[in-house]
Curated annotation (Swiss-Prot):
PROSITE patterns: YCGL (PS51648). Residues 1-85 form the YcgL domain. SUPFAM superfamilies: YcgL-like (SSF160191). This is YcgL domain-containing protein SG1337. Disulfide bonds: none annotated.
Amino acid sequence: MFCVIYRSSKQDQTYLFVERREDFYRVPADLMAHFGKPLFSMILPLDGSKKLASADTGKVKELFKEQGFYLQVPPPVESLLAQHQRAEKNLIIDPCILASE
């Protein structure tokens, strides 16, 4: 079994996996409209000989059987506030600097 991977023309880091090239008949029309024009990326075997970058091969196979495609979306972006708060917690203040003030 192979998967054909397309990247989205509208959504950054979003990929659509289908079983055959140009075979989008099982992908819902709303999803295709949101995805934009599929831009061919590559064809990979799903036999375990090659590892998928961000997807589990077993999950891709399972969803091919259930719905005929697999959609890979980017991980959620951490808010800038959360990044700032985490950085503040990890901030180490040199006591020598405080003593000189």
